[in-house]
Regions:
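Conserved N-terminal helical subregion
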Residues: 2-14, 31, 56-187, 229-242, ...
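C-terminal helical "tail/cap" subdomain of flavin- and related membrane-associated enzymes
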Residues: 2-12, 81, 255-257, 298, ...
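A structural signal for isolated positions on well-ordered beta-strands in alpha/beta enzyme cores
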Residues: 15, 38, 123, 223-225
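Conserved mid-domain beta->alpha element of the FAD-binding
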Residues: 16-34, 40, 153-154, 262-349
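Conserved Rossmann-like nucleotide-cofactor binding loop
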Residues: 22, 45, 159
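Conserved N-terminal glycine-rich FAD pyrophosphate-binding loop of Rossmann-like flavoproteins
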Residues: 44-62
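Conserved FAD/dinucleotide-binding core of flavoprotein oxidoreductases
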Residues: 91-101, 105-110, 114, 183-267
Length: 389
């Protein structure tokens, strides 16, 4: 049987910009299919940015395909219930009818992917930034070095230099509001009585708008998402202003004290992108470079990993890279227009959306709408994702 990963007697080679979740997934999946892969990370080491992460069925299926699911499950957590609170009272409890999901620190997931990449023989270069790419398969590094490849993958984030150097047409939105994401000790004993193994989405609108997403990652680590309007100088301040948050969420004081100690905390605004195409010539964009998503949908990493994995699958079926890439995009690209406009609005005006839809219609219905948005993206991915044989 002909090995399509060899062309004119040579093994096909990929250069990948960016060693985040999308880049690592693409690197591992291609390497497992016989490619040689060089992965470029502009930083001095492989590390994850951010705090915690939710993975749903689609992302977990990718981890299974890569052979690291058990590694990731160890040291992560599935809450018994996803609760929604309104003014510090529980109004909704969802179990998602058995839909697989998991919470973990971003570093935990990134470490598992990085270990697998090295085990599979991916060549990883740190302090190596791709500053330019050409559709012919050529990349230029910050040190002036030029490299050639059968495939270039732009997994270099929202500010992708691979994407921008080629000139992909894009629409980009930055929201008026944002959030502070932190990992702190769980302090479960200090929190006292309560169901502190649950995810708890806490919404308050009076006397001011503040929200906390409480997400246990494992026995030791807690992921906190603290949301407030950018116009609120106290709620958006970093490091966090302890009194401001304890006043609204007094029962969380033990973990908020830990959060206030984190001097490197950031207030990040939501960013989303929409591109006309994800591929040109021998170049494919994945992850935030192609489809940065609103964190409220909790599908950015999962969809990035599915798209990266499916790219390798497509290239395993179609020998010609320039034929495989548009075929992959046609098959995998989510149709974001199918999402109701209310979900797209979350990304642009999160606080205004919350005020209108949660306070006026009830937190339970909003929780269900968020669930429906997640399930839409999960099913959009899993319908086209095939388990490796």
């Amino acid at each position: 049987m002909t090995n399509i990963n060899r062309h004119n007697g040579k093994t096909r080679h990929a250069e990948i910009a960016g060693a985040g979740f999308a880049g690592l997934t693409a690197a591992i999946a291609l390497r497992q299919r016989g490619w040689t892969v060089r992965l470029h990370e502009k930083g001095p080491e492989l590390r994850a940015f951010g705090a915690g992460i939710y993975l749903w069925h689609n992302g977990l299926r990718v981890l299974e395909g890569l052979g690291i699911l058990e590694d990731v499950l160890s040291g992560s957590h599935t809450p018994p219930t996803y609760e929604t609170w309104m003014h510090n009272k529980s109004v909704s409890r969802e179990t998602f009818n058995g839909l697989p999901w998991r919470i973990m620190t971003r570093q935990h997931l990134h470490d598992a992917l990085a270990r697998k990449a090295k085990t599979e023989g991916v060549e990883v270069l740190v302090n190596s930034e791709v500053i330019q790419a050409k559709t012919s398969g050529q990349i230029t590094l910050a040190n002036g070095e030029v490299r050639e490849a059968d495939l270039v993958v732009g997994a270099d984030g929202v500010g992708s230099k691979v994407r921008d150097s080629i000139g992909f047409e894009q629409d980009r939105w930055i929201s008026t509001d944002g959030l502070i994401r932190l990992i702190v000790p769980r302090k479960k004993k200090e929190l006292g009585h309560g169901e502190w193994d649950n995810t708890i989405d806490m919404w308050n609108f009076w006397p001011r708008v503040q929200r906390i997403l409480y997400s246990p990652c494992n026995d030791n680590d807690l992921y906190l998402g603290l949301m407030a309007p950018a116009t609120d100088p106290n709620g958006s301040r970093v490091p966090i202003q302890l009194e401001c948050w304890v006043e609204m969420f007094p029962f969380l004081e033990p973990v908020l004290i830990e959060a206030a100690k984190l001097q490197a905390a950031r207030y990040d605004r939501y960013e989303t992108t929409k591109l006309d195409v994800w591929t040109k010539g021998k170049v494919a964009l994945v992850g935030d470079a192609a489809h940065a998503m609103c964190p409220a949908i909790a599908q950015g990493a999962g969809c990035a990993m599915v798209n990266s994995y499916s790219l390798a699958m497509e290239l395993d079926e179609i020998a010609n890279v320039q034929d495989a890439l548009p075929a992959w995009e046609k098959r995998i690209r989510p149709d974001y227009r199918s999402l109701p406009s209310r979900f797209r609005r979350i990304c642009r005006e999160p606080v205004a959306f919350q005020r209108k839809h949660v306070r006026s219609e009830g937190a339970r219905s909003s929780s269900l709408r968020s669930y429906e948005a997640r399930v839409f993206l999960v099913m959009a991915a899993t319908d086209i994702f095939e388990s490796p044989s």
